[in-house]
A protein has these predicted regions:
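A polyanion-binding, active-site-adjacent surface
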Residues: 2-104, 110-114, 119, 126-129, ...
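Short, charged, surface-exposed secondary-structure boundary motifs
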Residues: 134-141
Length: 142
């Protein structure tokens, strides 16, 4: 039997302008208590290439990026998005109301985008292909 898992708190700053919304942290990310902690996930590699800094929190701060996931909690057997069931969403609208500088919401992956559209149809989002290594159709260079 699968048990309910709870995601991470948002990483957000007063001057964040972009919110990147994932689906639910992987088991590795939950264990490490850091978004995109799986070494095979390309998220941090992409941002480090653009912003030329190694410190993850500093990288988010200087790039005015906030991170959160659409799922506050869910039932999931493995880290695969296809396994996500019984979603309790995070209060994305509440976060946007609190942090007025956020002007763009980017969904990291199709599950994130579809779930955002289901629970928050009035929030405009931009789709970005998943940075997960499970999304093998795109290379890091692409």
């Amino acid at each position: 039997m699968c048990k309910r898992i709870v995601g991470l708190d948002p990483i957000v700053f007063e001057d964040s302008r972009i919110l990147i919304v994932g689906s639910m942290p992987s088991a590795i990310s939950l264990k490490e208590q850091m978004y995109y902690a799986n070494k095979n996930n390309r998220f941090w590699k992409i941002l480090k290439e653009i912003f030329q800094t190694e410190d993850k929190i500093e990288l988010l701060k200087v790039s005015h990026i906030a991170l959160w996931d659409i799922c506050h909690s869910c039932i999931r057997k493995t880290s695969a998005d296809s396994e996500i069931k019984d979603i309790e969403p995070n209060d994305i609208q509440g976060l946007l109301d609190r942090y007025k500088n956020i002007e763009k919401v980017i969904c990291n992956g199709r599950t994130s985008q579809n779930t955002m559209q289901k629970y928050f149809p009035n929030i405009e989002t931009v789709y970005c292909p998943s940075t997960s290594s499970a999304n093998a159709q795109f290379s890091l260079e692409q």
